Amino acid sequence: MKKKVLFILHLPPPVHGSSMVGKYIMDSSIINAGINSEFINLGTSKSLDEIGKNPFQKIGLYVKIVLQTFKQLMVFKPDLVYIALTAKGKAFYKDAFIALLAKLFGKKNVYHLHNRSMVERQEKWLDVMLCKMLFKNTDVILLSKFLYPEIQKYVPQSRVYFCPNGIPPISNSFIKKEDSQEVQILFLSNLMKAKGVFVLLEACKILKEKQLPFHCTFVGGESDITSEIFQKKVSELDLSEKVHYAGKKYGAEKEKAFSEADIFAFPTLNETFGLVNLEAMQFSLPVVSTLEGGIPDIIMEGKTGFLVEKDDAQAFAEKLEMLIVDPVLRLKMGREGRKRYEENFTLEAFENCFTTILNELIK
C-alpha cells in the first residue's frame, strides 16, 4: 500500500520561488507516482501587492486552511506532513500553528524552507520557544548547505536534507538576438528593494559615467517599488536613456527577454536560492549576483559569473564592466552556466532528489 503524504504548500498566484516549487511538486509524476498525496494551498494572497493587506479577507482564508488541514489529518490520516514553512514575518506564526496542529495529531512533519529569518528570530524569546517546539524531532529540507546556520540552533545536521531547486526546460524555441552596439543587461524579478533594484540602478549610474555601451532592462511585477517610484529614481540618476522598465512578463515573453540579453544582473539583498539565476543560466547568460543565501551553490565565482557582497553598487558595477568590455568572457561564462544548469539544476534533477528524500522519510 502506498504511503500517504499531505502537502501543505504555496501555489501560484502570486508567482514567487516557493509557489513555483509548490506547483512543480504538485504536478510532478515522478514525485507523486509512489505515494498517495493530498494538497492544501497555504497562500492567502493572490498577488504580490495584496501581501500585508486585506486582513479580514485573509483571516477567512486562513480559517479555511486550518479546517482543511484538520479534516485531512482526521480523514486522510497521512504518514507524513510536508509543510513549506514560511520563516519571514507574521506568516511564520500562521504556518507554525498549522505545523503544531499536525504535531498534535502525532504526525511526522518535514519542513521545506524557501525563505530566511530564523537567525533574526533568535533575538525574541517567544520565537525561540516556538522554534524549539516546531523543530523538535522534525526533519528539514534546505535548498543549500549555506543555509544550515539559519537553523543549526534547533536542528541537528543528521535531520537535515539538502535539495537544490530545479526548473523545467525552455518551452519555446528562441532565436538569439543579433549583436548590437549596446550590451544588454537584464534584471528579472519583482520590483522590490530586497531584490536590489536600487543597487542596480546605482551601478548603472556608475557604468554610464564611464561611458560604457550598455542598456539595462528591468522586468517584473510592481511591489514595494511601484512603476512611479522606479521612474522617479531613474530620472534622479539621469538614466532615462540607459534603463527601461518593461513590466511583467511570463511564458514566451519572459523567454524572449532572456534571449535578448547578454548579461543577467541580480543584486538581491535577501535571498534563499534564486530560481531566476537558474533561468538565466538556462539561456547561457553570465550572471552577476550576490553572496546571499544559497546563491554561492549556484553561481561558480569566476566561471559562470561573479558574486559580490550585497548592497555594494560599486563592486557590482565593476563586475558588470568586466563583462561589458569582454564579449569572449561573456560567451565563455554563459556556456559554463548552461552546462552547470544541465548537470545540476534541471527540474528532473530536483524531482529525483526530492523523491529520494521523501522515500527516506516515509520508509
Name each model feature, range by range.
Residues 229-249:
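Nucleotide-activated donor-binding/catalytic signature segment of Leloir-type glycosyltransferases, i.e.
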Residues 6-8, 176-204, 216-222:
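Conserved donor-binding/catalytic core segment of Leloir-type glycosyltransferases
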Residues 286-289:
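Short hydrophobic beta-strand element within catalytic cores of glycosyltransferases
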Residues 269:
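Aromatic "clamp/platform" in nucleotide-sugar-dependent glycosyltransferases that forms part
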Residues 315, 322, 329-344, 350:
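A short, well-ordered alpha-helix in the C-terminal region of glycosyltransferases
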Residues 131-173:
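Donor nucleotide-sugar binding/catalytic pocket of nucleotide-sugar-dependent glycosyltransferases
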Residues 41-45, 188, 215-231, 247:
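Glycosyltransferase donor-sugar binding loop
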Residues 301-302, 306-313, 322-328:
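Conserved acidic donor-binding segment of nucleotide-sugar-dependent glycosyltransferases
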